Amino acid sequence: LEDGRIAVKLVFKHLVSAYQDGGDQQAREGMAMAAYYGGMAINQVNVGNVHAIAHQVGGKYGIPHGLANALILPHVLEYCREEAQSRLAELALVIGVGEAGEAEAQLAHKFIAAVRELRTEVGIPDRSDLIRREDHEALADAAIAEGMGYPVPRLLDEASTMAILSQITD
């Protein structure tokens, strides 16, 4: 799990700079290291619900995988917030958006808000006009089937997956 914490810290430190100035060597190196540590974390604990949904919308509509993940991430974090509260609270402290001693629920909320803000800073939209509502049921079924094998704090169900898809659909 330490690799994941390092990756998150590096992303929050370097992503905006790398996005705004592709020539910023330090930011690009920071993001390369974030990708490395993120990959190491995935190798240790696998992926989860975000990927299960992202694989479906990416495959169906040609949305690049990173963009699909970024589009979906805050919604799945919110869906799993209660079950993952202590880990989300820890990540809030890692990125410096909270103070030790704050309630875990508040810290978890601050971390999810920081993810949303970071996403906005790098031009990732809240919704996609490519995703069609008439496809939601099939996308949800496929995401649920894929997600069953992932070690997640909260399994997807049809209602929650349909709600997440609705939140990202124009």
Task: Locate each region found by the language model.
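Carboxylate- and glycine-rich phosphate/diphosphate-binding segment that chelates Mg2+/Mn2+
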Residues: 1-45, 153, 159
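A short beta-alpha structural unit
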Residues: 8, 32-37, 41, 56-60, ...
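A generic structural signal for well-ordered alpha-helical segments enriched in polar/charged residues
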Residues: 13, 17, 59, 117-120, ...
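NAD(P)-dependent dehydrogenase/reductase Rossmann-like domain
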Residues: 22-24, 34, 45-46, 60-66, ...
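Buried hydrophobic positions in well-ordered alpha/beta secondary-structure cores of metabolic enzymes
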Residues: 31, 51, 65, 73, ...
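Glycine-rich phosphate/pyrophosphate-binding beta-alpha loops
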Residues: 36-69, 146-151
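Mobile late-domain/C-terminal helix-loop "cap" segments
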Residues: 74-170
